[in-house]
Amino acid sequence: MIYMVSVSMMVLVLGLVAVASNPSPFYAALGLVLAAGAGCLVIVSFGSSFLSIVLFLIYLGGMLVVFAYSAARAKPYPEAWGSWSVVFYVLVYLIGVLVWYLFLGGVEVDGMNKSSELGSYVMRGDWVGVALMYSCWWVIIVYWWVSIIINFVCGIWVNSKSMWWESSCV
């Protein structure tokens, strides 16, 4: 079980690196599906299979909408995985993850159960995660304010741009 969680975490990081380093939405969608699947495997390993399936279906629906929009706005001949800029970004991100893991010690979340095989924790991981989320109430308020500001700024930015059909008229 510990090996499954470790491999799923590595696949999750590789999927996120694939999304962050690729300029083309066609290939980045593959990284998103990989990251979503690996994240849901991590959730399943903590004992919450129903939550994992629901999150995976919701996430795939959201990715479908975003992929359809970004594929419509993409260049007709996108850069592939082998182009030098993509390889450079992949190496930079992987070196950053490696440096973060080696020098900062990785991630340790207090209160979460590491595995059901260890036997030292009796609470399920999803309930402890909810308790940890609500124990830092100020973080939720900060996230709420940031989301309101982002929605306000994006709304002003979208309204200030001309629509694509207005500029293509002859």
UniProtKB/Swiss-Prot annotation:
Entries under InterPro entries matching the protein: ComplexI_Subunit6 (IPR050269), NADH_UbQ/plastoQ_OxRdtase_su6 (IPR001457), Nuo/plastoQ_OxRdtase_6_NuoJ (IPR042106)
Protein's membrane topology: Multi-pass membrane protein
GO MF, any single term: NADH dehydrogenase (ubiquinone) activity
Catalytic reactions on record: a ubiquinone + NADH + 5 H(+)(in) = a ubiquinol + NAD(+) + 4 H(+)(out)
Enzyme nomenclature, EC number: 7.1.1.2
Keyword RNA-binding appears in the UniProt entry: no
GO cellular component: mitochondrial inner membrane; mitochondrion
Chief site of localization: mitochondrion
Residue ranges crossing the lipid bilayer per the database entry: 1-21, 26-46, 49-69, 86-106, 138-158
Key words, A-Z: Electron transport, Membrane, Mitochondrion, Mitochondrion inner membrane, NAD, Respiratory chain, Translocase, Transmembrane, Transmembrane helix, Transport, Ubiquinone
Domain of life: Eukaryota
Enzyme class: translocase
Keyword Repeat: no
Gene3D superfamilies, per the entry: NADH-ubiquinone/plastoquinone oxidoreductase chain 6, subunit NuoJ
Family, per entry: Belongs to the complex I subunit 6 family.
Function, as annotated: Core subunit of the mitochondrial membrane respiratory chain NADH dehydrogenase (Complex I) which catalyzes electron transfer from NADH through the respiratory chain, using ubiquinone as an electron acceptor. Essential for the catalytic activity and assembly of complex I.
Oligomer status and interactors: Core subunit of respiratory chain NADH dehydrogenase (Complex I) which is composed of 45 different subunits.
Name recorded for this polypeptide: NADH-ubiquinone oxidoreductase chain 6
Organism encoding this protein: Xenopus laevis (African clawed frog)
Lineage: Eukaryota, Metazoa, Chordata, Craniata, Vertebrata
